[in-house]
């Protein structure tokens, strides 16, 4: 298991402990990827997981670029359309630095 896969597993477990339900992991399209798809109450939650072993280059949260946000939004839109879902959604970020987990709800 790669570090990225370990981080995604840790993020999934953490979010499940917070009351979210797991739907799918690593949804890939030619134009973008969604790390985790979760459900929280009425929301479909698209989660980006960022991992850094230390606070290098600004930390995990700063590693999310505007271009990457655009690709995630496009992938989420395609996911909703392809699954024929007309539901509210949000975009969360789980930032993992060493052993610290930070969950940003409705991050972008």
From Swiss-Prot:
Family under the similarity heading: Belongs to the UPF0102 family.
Protein name, entry field: UPF0102 protein SO_0299
Domain of life: Bacteria
Molecular function as annotated in GO: nucleic acid binding
Species of provenance: Shewanella oneidensis (strain ATCC 700550 / JCM 31522 / CIP 106686 / LMG 19005 / NCIMB 14063 / MR-1)
């Amino acid at each position: 298991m790669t570090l990225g896969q370990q981080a995604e597993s840790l993020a999934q477990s953490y979010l499940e402990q917070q009351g979210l339900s797991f739907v799918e992991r690593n949804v890939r399209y030619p134009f973008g990827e969604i790390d985790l798809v979760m459900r929280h109450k009425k929301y479909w939650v698209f989660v980006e997981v960022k991992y850094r072993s230390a606070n290098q280059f600004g930390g995990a949260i700063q590693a999310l670029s505007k271009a990457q946000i655009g690709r995630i939004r496009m992938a989420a839109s395609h996911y909703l359309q392809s699954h024929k879902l007309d539901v509210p959604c949000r975009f969360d970020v789980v930032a993992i630095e060493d052993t610290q987990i930070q969950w940003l709800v409705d991050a972008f």
